Amino acid sequence: YKGNVGSGDKARIFVCLTNMTKPGCTYHTVNTKSSEIDKTVLDPTQEFLYTNLNDPSTLEGHIIGYGDLLIEQSQSSWKQVDIQIHYRDKYASEKPNVLILTASASYRGDYFEGSTDSNLYLDDIEFIYE
C-alpha cells in the first residue's frame, strides 16, 4: 500500500473469512447513510453477522477468522505488509464461503471523523493459505 494519512486520521485494511449460512446470502451490507449505522456495522471481532444487530432473526452467518491493519502514518512509496488472520478455534474445521475485504483511507469517514486529505492505494493483493 501507499497513501497519505490526513491530520487526525487513520487508514484501515481488514479482511474477514466468513461462512454465510443464510440461504442466498453472499455479502454483508453496511448502510452508512442510515441513522441505524450501528445496527449494520461490520465488526470483525464479533462472531456473528446480522442485517440488523437488534434483530436475531436477521442472522446472515459467522466470522471464521479476521485480520486487521490500522495505518497511522503516510507512506509515499509502496510498502508490503502481511495481515495475519486470527481464527476462532470453534470454526477450525470449517471452510469459508465468503471473503470480505475492506480498505478505507479514512477508517471512520462514514462518521465524518477523518480528513479529506487522506488517500490509500492498494496493489498486488495476494492471499496465501494452506
Residue spans for each PLM region:
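Cysteine-clustered segments with highest specificity for TGF-beta superfamily mature ligands
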Residues: 97-101
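Extracellular carbohydrate recognition
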Residues: 75-77, 91-95, 105-129
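Predominantly extracellular/luminal cell-surface or secreted proteins
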Residues: 16-20, 128
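Extended, low-complexity, turn-rich repeat/linker tracts enriched in Gly/Pro/Ser/Thr and Asp/Glu
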Residues: 2-9, 21-24
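One-face residue pattern on beta-strands with alternating periodicity enriched for small/polar residues
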Residues: 2, 12-16, 80-86, 102, ...
